């Protein structure tokens, strides 16, 4: 660690996570008198304009959102030529870690998590923000039980250029196992519908402990998204209600026009599916046949 105090305000106490893009430190804010997370971008602003631009995008994106299920940002700055973000220190476990510990999650758990994730994602979309990297690793269950979305490093506000997965150039924005087909083809920009595709895959992972399309070879995963039939959730986990499987299928349609067009549509169907699961006698047979006819 190159510093112990940032801007004579934030006292660094621990390195709590690092990757190619950034390092996250636990710190104490001497003005607010509370623990915070400091995300220090691994670049020199004078030498890496691309990384600095990504940082500015993340800071602008996160500052635009105020929601219980989205991590809060308190400020940003530059110290020793390194940009940093000051955020809530989120105590808890990632959804990915929770899935690993349990192999798969139960219907009640999946429903509870999904409703909170949808709430946070709706706040993003209402601000014209697309997350672009929805996945279990970027969803944290706090010690108080609330779920929050984190890591807006690849998000954007409003109109941006189309983003491609390029096989020979290996250009990837997001995580390949959760990228919507239209992003892989490059024929549409990221949208609420591509976030919904990733959310459907996240839901699949919650129920099975696996991604539907996965391989150590990224071009193979891309081709699966584009051409392979979506695998059955119930084949891996027969306890999943068919109504929930149908919802996942609709989230993950290859044609974005056949998916839920916004997260509120998804929320409504989840509420109906959960009511059917908890009170099956109250629901008419065949009620969900309309899911793919909307």
Predicted regions and their residues:
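Protein kinase glycine-rich loop
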Residues: 13-19, 24
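Activation segment signature within eukaryotic-like protein kinase domains
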Residues: 113-114
């Amino acid at each position: 660690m190159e510093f112990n105090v940032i801007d004579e305000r934030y006292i660094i106490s621990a390195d709590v996570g690092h990757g190619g893009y950034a390092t996250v430190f636990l710190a104490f804010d001497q003005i607010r008198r509370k623990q915070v997370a400091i995300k220090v971008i691994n670049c020199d602003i004078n030498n890496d304009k691309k990384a600095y631009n990504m940082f500015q995008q993340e800071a602008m994106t996160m500052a635009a959102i105020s929601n219980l299920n989205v991590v809060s940002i308190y400020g940003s700055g530059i110290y020793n030529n390194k940009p940093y973000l000051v955020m809530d220190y989120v105590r808890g476990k990632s959804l990915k870690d929770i899935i690993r510990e349990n192999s798969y999650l139960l219907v009640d758990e999946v429903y509870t998590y999904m409703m909170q994730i949808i709430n946070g994602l709706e706040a993003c979309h209402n601000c014209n923000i697309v997350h672009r990297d929805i996945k279990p690793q970027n969803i944290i269950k706090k010690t108080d039980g609330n779920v929050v979305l984190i890591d807006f490093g690849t998000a954007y506000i409003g109109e941006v250029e189309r983003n491609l997965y390029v096989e020979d150039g290996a250009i990837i924005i997001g995580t390949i196992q959760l990228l919507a087909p239209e992003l892989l083809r490059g024929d549409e920009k990221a949208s609420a519908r591509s976030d919904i595709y990733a959310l459907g895959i996240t839901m699949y992972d919650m129920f099975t402990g696996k991604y539907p399309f996965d391989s150590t070879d990224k071009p193979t995963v891309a081709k699966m998204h584009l051409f392979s039939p979506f695998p059955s959730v119930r084949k891996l986990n027969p306890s999943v209600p068919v109504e929930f499987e149908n919802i996942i299928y609709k989230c993950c349609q290859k044609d974005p026009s056949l998916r839920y067009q916004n997260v509120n549509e998804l929320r409504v169907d989840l509420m109906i599916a959960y009511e059917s699961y908890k009170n099956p006698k109250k629901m008419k047979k065949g009620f969900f046949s309309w899911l793919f006819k909307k």
